[in-house]
Amino acid sequence: EIGVRLVGSEMCIRDRFIDLLRALNEVEGIERYRISSIEPNLLTDEIIAFCASSPKFQHHFHIPLQSGSDSVLARMRRRYTTEKFAERIEAVRRLMPDAFIGIDVIVGFPGETESDFRTTYEFLERLAPAYLHIFPFSERPGTPAVDFPDKVQPSVATRRVEELEELCRRLHGEFCARAEGTTDEVLFESTMRGGMMFGYTGNYRRVKAPYDRSRINTICRVRLGRMDDANDLEGEIVDN
């Protein structure tokens, strides 16, 4: 995993990022890349189309939302609205219908009302991402939010986290279950548990199969079977 921080105007960053993706696409010996975090206002149609056409860039996007309430986003000083965010998700799905979409969410931001939270919950439910990364708001010294009024009680923030975690479990299960009975390419990793090896499809569904050392760190064609309680799909290797 490599972290890249690009500095400059929004337009400059977008241009430099697509140039970086094109350069990485030409590197020999690396078969898979995943974009682990990209702001929605930087996820251009050009980047989406590039990832859809590249055999190396996997159909996986981790996009920070933080709140599904536009009033909360404004207080957070985010450069996008929920409408813009939803439009970017739709743009991804037009070209990559089965893309893994992970979303960051913060609950309990100062001033977040119960109505704001319900709006966020319903927005996420409509978007139906594959996964939610949920965080309770925590103050950071020196940031404007430290001085914001209307702090959310920790018990309220905890309850909101738990509600979104339950939503995440349901959405992730639905995403994984859609692959039952299909065939996909899986990169098996070195993890072994209970005689099984584990790996991931390009769009980040986790797959388990009987451990075979010769398959570790290789991409195998796998028939995907039943999903278990941990949302792991049973895999049967069908070729090399």
Regions found by a protein language model. Name each.
Residues 15-19, 32-49, 108-119:
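Canonical radical SAM enzyme core domain
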